[in-house]
């Protein structure tokens, strides 16, 4: 891979990283300020803040991986640093996906209209248990990732002990195929929350269809607040599903480099696509949340006023 292509993709990745940090930091900052002001936090704000923090960490890990690939390519052949990066990438990836799934589940229970006793019971208790669900997602992600990381590091530790007795440096390498297969297994686990999110999406569509049908039969129109809430929730869920599919394909592209030689370009390109998912989805969430949307418009208006004031002062001085 030429230096020109490396530099171009790296700068594009830095740009995506900056946009993603800006959007997710804005979500976290607005919700935390509201939390301090009101001394309590709503369930939806807690989910969005947790999701924003996990995605900030995910963006940092992906960008660090890009830098390591470009500046220290030998680390991808062997080394403990690679395993550490992979562990935190997989962990933050799992947390981000689980938290996004929690958001989809929350939308489903708060907006959908079903009359099954179990659904009504869950709908009534969702605000009380959402913090425990988020905590459970964190614990589950850590327990899934730690054993796999220990398996990867076991060979490394055995090699260090062997090197003290012999000079077998070749034994300190974990094969690329073994490493890639472990990463593939860890990311296949994310298909579970993806399936849950997909199920909530279809149930929301069913609820919306039934609601519109009732509105048509009662001749009250279809653009009532409940319909608008359904549409906003569906936009947030379907954007997550589409971006997650693109993210998963980018991961498969990056993982292919472990089996095909000389594919650093595929890795960087895959990571460039991977950055789109945590970066762009944050802005979709901002536009779909009334409080965040108002705060963003207020910030935008303030920035425009400052810029206009500076231009006026410069024109006055001239």
From Swiss-Prot:
Segments traversing the membrane: 10-30, 56-76, 95-115, 129-149, 188-208, 236-256, 267-287
Topological domains annotated Cytoplasmic: 31-55, 116-128, 209-235, 288-318
Gene Ontology MF terms: bitter taste receptor activity; G protein-coupled receptor activity
SUPFAM superfamilies for this protein: Family A G protein-coupled receptor-like
Chief location bin: membrane
Extracellular compartment residues: 1-9, 77-94, 150-187, 257-266
CC annotations in GO: membrane; plasma membrane
UniProt-annotated location(s): Membrane
Membrane topology: Multi-pass membrane protein
Listed GO biological process terms: detection of chemical stimulus involved in sensory perception of bitter taste
Note: Several bitter taste receptors are expressed in a single taste receptor cell.
Described function: Gustducin-coupled receptor implicated in the perception of bitter compounds in the oral cavity and the gastrointestinal tract. Signals through PLCB2 and the calcium-regulated cation channel TRPM5.
Family of this protein: Belongs to the G-protein coupled receptor T2R family.
Name used for this protein in its record: Taste receptor type 2 member 7
Organism of origin: Macaca mulatta (Rhesus macaque)
Designated gene of the protein: TAS2R7
